[in-house]
Each structure stands twice: as structure tokens, then as C-alpha cells.
């Protein structure tokens, strides 16, 4: 018997299950036509070629005991590490936001659109973000608005804005609420400087006022938005996200550790030698660098041939700097 993952309870189109230590995804008949459209239109191939979407292989119906005839069963590429948005640094969430907007823009070229916009649909392969929800697409209908607009603003834009202007610890808000930061709360946290950013003014401040005027409702499914208008909306969101960055002069407990520590050059070289010897002796497949700071020893592990290196630090700024150095 295949055990359905409890993480799939919200998706009526399909579910995740595990069999023999492997992860599979079963697509319900209600989504078969959309899935075939994704595959036949060229959207899947385009996203794969651009390294934006997780790859999968399709299991022939009835070919295996766990692949029922009436459903489509996929075996997605397995990731070495699963992380969650409240564990990410600023630039990781920003990368996921920009990727989602890029995918939305591409999907429209193939007559499709994203039906939700949650950071939980993204993971990381190394330092690169990748979209993992193949069932998140729907057919685009001319004149319809972007349904997950508010969801995007609350789950991506609002956390990034508040982290920039207040404190990066607000990125952990996702551990308390899977719905992100409510628009009205995000606006209350904005300093005056935030109102000078046109994108923030439109997509957070104006959006919050409009939502409050409608009694807290999200994007209206009855609103008419032309294709040109939707393309402009996605582009405006992209520019708004791109304009956000962490202040370069912000400091934290460990952000200046390398320059202010008591280690001299000989001490550092000796420590590097010890780490190299340790790794080459044990030949581990995975190394966990706890308190990695700028990732000096994580990089050494990679150079020594370790297949998977996980760098962890509780200091948001040092992790943000490390990730930025890897993706630039």
C-alpha cells in the first residue's frame, strides 16, 4: 500500500507518495488534460532546458503495482536536501520570487498560467533555486486576472520588503504563517522610505487598501485584465523584486568575523590543513558545515571532492553573503 504524503492534503489534482525509498507523484484524472497540455505545448521542455523546473519521468500506467491505470504516475528527480522558506536567507527568497515570475512569463507564451504563488513550491539544487510543482499550471483564459497576485505579494514581496527595511528575522514569519505576511501588517511595518519605492507603493500599500475596501478579499476572479495588462503586472512585480537588496552597511554578530577574529594567517592555514586531512581520510559523501560563516571550509570540502556540502549558520547576513557569492 502506498502511503500518501500528508504534505499533499491541499492539492486535489495530485498527491505525493513514497514507494521503495523513492518519491512519486500521482496525478488525478481531473488534471490529466492540463498535464498533457504542459507536456505537449513545449512548456515543460522549455522550463527544463532553462533549468527552471524539476525533471520527471512518467511511469507507464499499470506497468508497476503502484502505478494505477486510471492515474498518471510521475517519478520526479530526487533532491539531496529539502529546505523551507523560513530557513532561507534574503537572496534565496528573492531568487525564488524572480524565478516564479520568470516561469509565469514563459507559461503565458504557451497559453498557460500559474494558479498559485507560494515559496513552498521551490527548492534548491546546490545554490540554484528550482521549481518543483509541475501541477501548478492552469490554462490561461484571456481577460482573467492573475489569481495568485495577492499570494505572491504576501509570501514573497512583503517578507522581502520588511526584511530590507526592518530586520531579516521577519523572513522566519513563514514558520508561523504559511500564508506569508498579511498586506496590512506589512504596510504598518513600512518606514517612510518604503513609500518612495513605486513598486512597494503599488503592490503593497495600494494593494492593501484595495483589499481592505473589498473586505479582505483577494484578487477578484471576476475582474477583467487583458493579456497586455497581465504581462505588465508580472514585469512590474519583477522590477519591484529586483530593486530590493539588503543594506550594504548592515552588520550582525558574526558578519565581520573573518576580519575581526584573532586568527592570523598561519592559524587559518593550519586549520585548513586539518580539515583537508580529515575529509580525505574519511571520504564522506556529505559534509555538514555548522557555523559556516563565509563558507571557507565548505569550499574546501567541495575542492576535496565531497559530493554534497551543506553550509549552515544562524547569522542571516553571513549566509546571505555566502549564497550571493555562489550564485553571482
For each feature predicted by the language model, list its residue ranges.
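Conserved SAM-binding motif I beta-strand of class I
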Residues: 308-313
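Conserved structural core of kinase catalytic domains
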Residues: 56-95
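Conserved SAM-binding loop and adjacent beta-strand
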Residues: 244, 259-274
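Conserved class I S-adenosyl-L-methionine
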Residues: 283-293
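S-adenosyl-L-methionine
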Residues: 323-328
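Conserved SAM-binding loop of SAM-dependent methyltransferases across substrates and taxa
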Residues: 294-306
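Catalytic activation segment of kinase domains across protein kinase-like and atypical kinase folds
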Residues: 113, 118-164
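N-terminal auxiliary segments of SAM/dcSAM-dependent transferases
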Residues: 150-245
